[in-house]
Swiss-Prot record:
Topology term for the membrane: Multi-pass membrane protein
Chain intervals for the UniProt region annotation (Disordered): 1-20
The organism's taxonomic lineage, starting at the top: Eukaryota, Metazoa, Chordata, Craniata, Vertebrata
Protein name: P2Y purinoceptor 4
Origin species: Rattus norvegicus
Processing after translation: Phosphorylation of Ser-329 and Ser-330 is a key step in agonist-dependent desensitization and loss of surface P2RY4. This phosphorylation does not involve PKC, nor other calcium-activated kinases.
Transmembrane segments: 31-58, 69-91, 109-127, 150-170, 193-218, 243-265, 284-305
Amino acid sequence: MTSAESLLFTSLGPSPSSGDGDCRFNEEFKFILLPMSYAVVFVLGLALNAPTLWLFLFRLRPWDATATYMFHLALSDTLYVLSLPTLVYYYAARNHWPFGTGLCKFVRFLFYWNLYCSVLFLTCISVHRYLGICHPLRAIRWGRPRFASLLCLGVWLVVAGCLVPNLFFVTTNANGTTILCHDTTLPEEFDHYVYFSSAVMVLLFGLPFLITLVCYGLMARRLYRPLPGAGQSSSRLRSLRTIAVVLTVFAVCFVPFHITRTIYYQARLLQADCHVLNIVNVVYKVTRPLASANSCLDPVLYLFTGDKYRNQLQQLCRGSKPKPRTAASSLALVTLHEESISRWADTHQDSTFSAYEGDRL
């Protein structure tokens, strides 16, 4: 057994082999795949999210509810990508972590903090869209920017609170001259970590994903009704774009990662056949960069669904100055919402899409 193989086996946890208890992994692919993947996510994520934060802070105020959710989504993505250089070094150095236990805990914590904050912020956007399309009067009440800000603060705190045990599970472990930064925990604590991780997954991924699917199913049923008017067609197109982008992020980033991670954890707990466990391990490691890629895909949501964001981004790329805000444009959101209430009261049905017209980035 080579030293590299011994190191990889030590990091596994409970011995998965049903024979002599020695199941060695050949993870050479990981030392190429993960550094390259995380480096790409770092460059693209920072290049896409840093200008987004600047636009939200200096060119897109005042925010409506959707802009509030998207700002916090971009902030979460930016914080995460800033931690990726340490992981690039760690995997390029073949599982050697020289940065101390505290930073190991923080980087692993930040991965899941970003992951589940992103899930919940996308769920907030989905519910907000659903209310604007299917229940416009409730959208006026619950879609206020102040309520959205409080909800975002709650998301940050709830996710952080749920992940506090992760700070105790994750640790470093010396193996000769190499120091491991566990992405789970020590072998003797692995079964407890799986129970904790499964509970967090159900609460912060399973339930929000179910809510998102229900909202978009109800939205799709309403959106495919025939509607007159160009403005309503524009609103419908924007909503369909939102559905497409959010479901793509879930399908590409979140769902594969959680499925393969669950299979991998259970295979280790049940001490599956070594050959099976090797295959599961490879598939799981491949989906980890996909989970990080949501930091690059989220900006597509702002670009496809936000007219104001798209216009300001074009001005920023051209180096032109923003146009001065007029009183009429400052009051546009209020006027359009008031108009939507009037239309809804008159028709009780088809103008529900207009209630969302003012909610443009």
